[in-house]
Amino acid sequence: MSVPKAKALLTVCAALLLCGCGQALSEREIVRAVFFARQQGAYSACLLLADQNTESDGVQYKTASARGDTAAQALHLAEDALPGRLYYGLLDLAALPPGCDWADAQTLGTLLYDKAQPAPELSVFVLDTADHSWAADAASLYEDMKAVEREYDLHCGLQQLFTQTDGCAVPAYRADSGYDFALLAADGASVYVSGLQAQLAAALCGQTDRFFTAFAGGQAVCDTRVNVTAEDTTVQLHLRDTDFQPLGAYNEDWQALLCTELQQAFSALTADDAADFFHLQFWHVNLWGPGSALPVPRLEILFE
């Protein structure tokens, strides 16, 4: 086969793949987000879809939702409620149910992966505990979560649910500002943290490179770029272009106060060894071999 013909064939194959073997995207149900919740012992699943039949300007959405004994059943029933064939290729957000644990994350992550693999742009959050109406709230939840990602340079991909066998870490949505962070251990209790501690956990997990949070009891806001390196169990936190914004007539050593809070947050995050969320045990074993005693993790803060 000649090179031009081979290129033409590849182009046709790619077009058929994107269009669903000849069916145009305009004729399909395009899924943008999937939300899960648990209600009275059952699962609820909501599909947020692009509404291609509206004549309004801008992006418009519609929803399909259902309840089931399992998450898979609820999702399948929501899919069956739609007249067209579903297209998951543009799915870029999934929300796990509030209060979920590691087993839930694995089950739902596998279900989503089967639908949307490899889904490189798919982001994962844990939903908040508010009582949401899917029809009324799904679109705003989607827009809010994507806005949090942009503002805080935050991203937890679907694949991050499966990178460790002892736990996973996922940002948790909150309606007011910022985000919480869920540490879901396979053999321990799930831990949810907020504020500076949540953003430090996200940085240690490689899910953000920015701190933008209040500290010192709400007296100031810190905005800084973050990079994390490690030498054995010593974690080096590199802070660049750091800006402190006092929220009142305060005259404090903001750098010292931030360092104190970061050290306290780090100690709290690393006190529970139910799972190696920050890969400290992994790197120590790689350096010193299995069975070597793990030193107490230490945080070194470097302003650059």
What are these regions, as identified by a protein language model?
Residues 14-15:
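Residue-level signal for mature regions of secreted extracellular proteins and peptides
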Residues 2, 8-9, 18-304:
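Membrane-proximal alpha-helical signals and transmembrane carboxylates
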